[in-house]
């Protein structure tokens, strides 16, 4: 039996940096660029899981499950000693948390069947090579001829989409194996989404070695939403290194208890049909954790000034949300709020000495912002050199004008659009 789940990418159009603080919220748009995970249940009962990602070189991982320790251990097996070791903390920890959610320490469960997983993501997540002379388009899941560690990302949330779709697919597969009530449905209702979301947040944070804002996993699970961060203390005791075995006889019980509850309010949101969202790839790339640390250091050194900036940013987020929810046309108000957000982020860029909106981005964004019909522009999320977004009135001539201007400035328009739905069964 095969179960395939998909999860969307994300763009945080309002709420960068303040979304790290649970007292604020951010406006996240889910994207049609998706991550896909297909889990096939095999007849074998060897206690193994094989995972492959065919878009990359040396992207296959084999894991063995040790049922006798607590928590249950998932460790990588290297079949070919000639190949360079290729640990994948995101995959390994996703398996670790889902297996410990469903099973308790002891013997291998009688219901267990080995699993084979295939991971794929849409092309928009990565910078693509130039088309060959005989090509007019890329295959849906283009082979990138590099390792996973060498790929250049576009900043749309590939790791969050991958880990959420993977945990969703594993969760549904193992639920079918362990459910003795006869219910073999593949439904993803809200209660299932809560558990998958929480498991994905824990696995994602463990793999990154820190508790981030989580809005990327939030969008991957819930789709477009008004996102408020959960309290990091909820999960700190459950974070584990992928390559170390911890000892905790109550781990599975504690995990099940914590992930079964909703951690924070996530309000579904849909971009009004009168607007369109465009994304542009600037072929750069930024280290989000490094940028966040610099801003946090600036906050510590300038508590009053930074709080005023963040409060001002949040007031703009709320205004944008209210404009979108209003039945009236408030284009000029939206334009004013998006421009104010840019000015605040430009100020933080200078004062915190971090490239939230680098000069190269500013010059291009200024050109786009002045075009007729453009509502707002910016560098999403933590900013940097990953991508740009443009919110515009949904009219063909306006869209074509934005795309032409981007191309003239060396920005590649991305084949993505807003997605309202989150995690889904394909």
Swiss-Prot record:
<keyword id="KW-0443">Lipid metabolism</keyword>
<dbReference type="GO" id="GO:0005739">
    <property type="term" value="C:mitochondrion"/>
</dbReference>
<dbReference type="GO" id="GO:0005524">
    <property type="term" value="F:ATP binding"/>
</dbReference>
<dbReference type="GO" id="GO:0010142">
    <property type="term" value="P:farnesyl diphosphate biosynthetic process, mevalonate pathway"/>
</dbReference>
<dbReference type="InterPro" id="IPR035102">
    <property type="entry name" value="Phosphomevalonate_kinase"/>
</dbReference>
<keyword id="KW-0067">ATP-binding</keyword>
<keyword id="KW-0547">Nucleotide-binding</keyword>
<dbReference type="GO" id="GO:0005634">
    <property type="term" value="C:nucleus"/>
</dbReference>
<dbReference type="InterPro" id="IPR036554">
    <property type="entry name" value="GHMP_kinase_C_sf"/>
</dbReference>
<feature type="binding site">
    <location>
        <begin position="151"/>
        <end position="161"/>
    </location>
    <ligand>
        <name>ATP</name>
    </ligand>
</feature>
<comment type="pathway">
    <text>Isoprenoid biosynthesis; isopentenyl diphosphate biosynthesis via mevalonate pathway; isopentenyl diphosphate from (R)-mevalonate: step 2/3.</text>
</comment>
<comment type="function">
    <text>Phosphomevalonate kinase; part of the second module of ergosterol biosynthesis pathway that includes the middle steps of the pathway. Erg8 converts 5-phosphomevalonate to 5-diphosphomevalonate. The second module is carried out in the vacuole and involves the formation of farnesyl diphosphate, which is also an important intermediate in the biosynthesis of ubiquinone, dolichol, heme and prenylated proteins. Activity by the mevalonate kinase erg12 first converts mevalonate into 5-phosphomevalonate.</text>
</comment>
<dbReference type="InterPro" id="IPR020568">
    <property type="entry name" value="Ribosomal_Su5_D2-typ_SF"/>
</dbReference>
<dbReference type="GO" id="GO:0006696">
    <property type="term" value="P:ergosterol biosynthetic process"/>
</dbReference>
<dbReference type="GO" id="GO:0019287">
    <property type="term" value="P:isopentenyl diphosphate biosynthetic process, mevalonate pathway"/>
</dbReference>
<keyword id="KW-0444">Lipid biosynthesis</keyword>
<keyword id="KW-0756">Sterol biosynthesis</keyword>
<dbReference type="GO" id="GO:0005829">
    <property type="term" value="C:cytosol"/>
</dbReference>
<dbReference type="GO" id="GO:0005777">
    <property type="term" value="C:peroxisome"/>
</dbReference>
<keyword id="KW-0496">Mitochondrion</keyword>
<keyword id="KW-0418">Kinase</keyword>
<dbReference type="GO" id="GO:0004631">
    <property type="term" value="F:phosphomevalonate kinase activity"/>
</dbReference>
<comment type="similarity">
    <text>Belongs to the GHMP kinase family. Mevalonate kinase subfamily.</text>
</comment>
<keyword id="KW-0414">Isoprene biosynthesis</keyword>
<keyword id="KW-0752">Steroid biosynthesis</keyword>
<protein>
    <recommendedName>
        <fullName>Phosphomevalonate kinase</fullName>
        <ecNumber>2.7.4.2</ecNumber>
    </recommendedName>
</protein>
<dbReference type="InterPro" id="IPR014721">
    <property type="entry name" value="Ribsml_uS5_D2-typ_fold_subgr"/>
</dbReference>
<keyword id="KW-0808">Transferase</keyword>
<dbReference type="InterPro" id="IPR016005">
    <property type="entry name" value="Erg8"/>
</dbReference>
<keyword id="KW-0539">Nucleus</keyword>
<keyword id="KW-0963">Cytoplasm</keyword>
<keyword id="KW-0753">Steroid metabolism</keyword>
<keyword id="KW-1207">Sterol metabolism</keyword>
